[in-house]
From Swiss-Prot:
One of its GO terms (biological process) is negative regulation of transcription by RNA polymerase II. This is THAP domain-containing protein 7. The modification Phosphoserine is found at residues 162, 210. Signal peptide: none annotated. Forms homodimers. Interacts with HDAC3 and nuclear hormone receptor corepressors. Interacts via HBM with HCFC1. It comes from the Eukaryota. It comes from Mus musculus. Residues 198-209 have a biased composition (Pro residues). Keywords: Chromosome, DNA-binding, Metal-binding, Nucleus, Phosphoprotein, Transcription, Transcription regulation, Zinc, Zinc-finger. Chromatin-associated, histone tail-binding protein that represses transcription via recruitment of HDAC3 and nuclear hormone receptor corepressors. GO terms for cellular component: chromatin; nuclear membrane; nuclear speck.
Amino acid sequence: MPRHCSAAGCCTRDTRETRNRGISFHRLPKKDNPRRGLWLANCQRLDPSGQGLWDPTSEYIYFCSKHFEENCFELVGISGYHRLKEGAVPTIFESFSKLRRTAKTKGHGYPPGLPDVSRLRRCRKRCSERQGPTTPFSPPPRADIICFPVEEASAPATLPASPAVRLDPGLNSPFSDLLGPLGAQADEAGCSTQPSPEQHPSPLEPQPASPSAYMLRLPPPAGAYIQNEHSYQVGSALLWKRRAEAALDALDKTQRQLQACKRREQRLRLRLTKLQQERAREKRAQADARQTLKDHVQDFAMQLSSSMA
């Protein structure tokens, strides 16, 4: 299991990406070290009962380098390695109330980009109730509140034709200043836009073939609908099958090359043995010839000495 930061609200894990970003992890001092209390006090993390400070029993508690100031590290050697100083204490932590408020907002907030239907209906009802001649002024709506459905907002050209958008001139609405220029622009666009023969060709004219007709239709890869959320995801089974087949083919080819190299080595060994045997025979023949010559010289010397005597 990879190391992770134990600070409240910190989700940093010891991965290749974090190491490339220069984030390091440092273990919590042991219980006999006086700096342990400072680390836990600055962490502001409560125990499971919520009464006192957090005092873990595990020896594998780490804090990432994002909770330390820059002056807490020192440069070691020429490799650029940053080491934590002996008396360093983590001081950069988010307050507990801020973390709770963030978690509450994330838990009860609406996801961005997806409007709530009931919220839109209530907003439209409030907008319709506020419309009237006695209303002096209505503040503009907030940017995060959408008072119109998505269908009407996505097609502004159809707003002038909608009966819900047409308002009486005597009524005041917080959206009248927005709908007026929008409706005028839509009317001008509708009047200026006229069908042309270039935009609507006759069906009798021959159309050129689409390039997509000549393209190869490839099926989607296996598991394409699965979202890749982790770096250790399995991936496409077809791709892994092709890789396995390629690896098996490469293994078969390597084995054939190995067998051929072994046969070549055996032939070279046999040839070397024959050459060594021929060399040994030549050496023995030369030794025999020298011995024979030596014997002949000795016999000739003996005959010569006997004849002179």
